[in-house]
């Protein structure tokens, strides 16, 4: 029977530990350190018990809550409420106090999604026609794709999570567009490369890759292998990913907040283990073969996406978002 308890990050770790196989074409996935984020706080009963990927549910609920509670919206997703379902939407609306408690985390989730889609639009404008979403969860971009018919979207996820997503799409009345290709990959049986080849992914075409909420759970070596995945793709390919800076780079308030969150995920046996400083990371990326990088820090992200708001929605953490192009 399919294991429905597998988390989104643990699934990705299995995939990305073998990312160098994209270049070598022969290596299977390596044994990965178990790592997964603690699920974001969700209303009781939201999305139903026993469903796969609590982290995918948590991120989807935060995107949905943003549509309900935040104005103006940083990330406008007209399908965010539909895909989580009427029961989850009702639970969100019935508990606005919880939305205030999750405001900072919600800001992070919607900022990184908005930034990734802004970068995707820019990549499309310069000719990129493939979008690879690693650990797509309940992401709805493919179903509201403004470039439908021109941009092919490939969503990689565990088969259980993709089956659950397809059921959610059907239940919500959201059609699966022709430009969306699901790539269910069971890393106990196949590599990421073979899974993508089976569904028609073109490794010889420039590709935009999103990798959100993963890097901090990887060992440094696995993180580097993950980034090598993109350098093995066609020139012009690009990745957007988020990461955290080391403790020494944080102020007292930020450090205290991190320690509370870190203790929670460590107690679950899934610690954050890898941090990067922006300038050394940019140098590392150039050494791997990326031709250009662009780092968005929290100060710049707040200025770009959360300026002049009256509702208090803003980043308060230490997460940066990096964009790197081959």
PLM region spans:
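Conserved acidic residues
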Residues: 186-191
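Conserved beta-strand signature within the Rossmann-like core of class I S-adenosyl-L-methionine
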Residues: 234-244
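N-terminal secretory signal peptides
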Residues: 1-7
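A short, conserved alpha-helix within the catalytic core of class I
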Residues: 218-229
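A conserved beta-strand element that flanks and buttresses the S-adenosyl-L-methionine
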Residues: 210
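Rossmann-like AdoMet/SAM-dependent catalytic core
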Residues: 252-326
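Rossmann-like AdoMet
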Residues: 5, 12-132, 138-183, 203
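Short amphipathic alpha-helix with an adjacent loop that forms part of the alpha/beta core around
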Residues: 192-203
């Amino acid at each position: 029977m399919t294991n429905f308890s597998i988390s989104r990050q643990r699934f990705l770790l299995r995939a990305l530990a073998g990312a160098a196989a994209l270049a070598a074409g022969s290596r299977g996935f390596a044994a990965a350190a178990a790592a997964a984020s603690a699920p974001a706080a969700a209303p009781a009963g939201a999305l139903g018990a026993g469903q796969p990927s609590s982290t995918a549910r948590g991120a989807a609920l935060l995107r949905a809550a943003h549509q309900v509670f935040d104005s103006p919206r940083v990330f406008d997703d007209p399908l965010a409420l539909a895909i989580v379902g009427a029961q989850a939407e009702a639970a969100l609306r019935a508990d606005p106090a919880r939305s205030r408690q999750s405001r900072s985390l919600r800001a992070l989730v919607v900022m990184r999604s908005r930034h990734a889609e802004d970068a995707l639009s820019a990549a499309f404008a310069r000719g990129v026609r493939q979008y690879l979403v690693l650990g797509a969860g309940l992401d709805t971009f493919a179903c509201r794709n403004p470039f439908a018919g021109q941009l092919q979207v490939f969503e990689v996820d565990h088969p259980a999570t993709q089956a659950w997503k397809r059921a959610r799409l059907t239940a919500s009345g959201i059609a699966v567009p022709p430009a969306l290709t699901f790539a269910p990959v069971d890393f106990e049986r196949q590599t990421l490369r073979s899974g993508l080849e089976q569904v028609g992914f073109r490794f010889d075409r420039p590709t935009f890759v999103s990798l959100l909420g993963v890097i901090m759970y990887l060992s440094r070596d696995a993180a580097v292998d993950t980034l090598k995945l993109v350098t093995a793709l066609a020139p012009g390919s690009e990745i957007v990913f988020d990461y955290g800076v080391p403790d020494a780079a944080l102020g007292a308030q930020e450090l205290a907040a991190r320690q509370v969150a870190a203790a929670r995920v460590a107690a679950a046996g899934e610690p954050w283990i890898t941090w990067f400083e922006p300038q050394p990371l940019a140098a590392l990326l150039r050494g791997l073969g990326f031709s250009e990088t662009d780092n968005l820090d929290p100060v710049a992200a707040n200025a770009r996406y959360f300026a002049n708001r009256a509702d208090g929605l803003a980043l308060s953490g230490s997460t940066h978002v990096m964009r790197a192009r081959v």
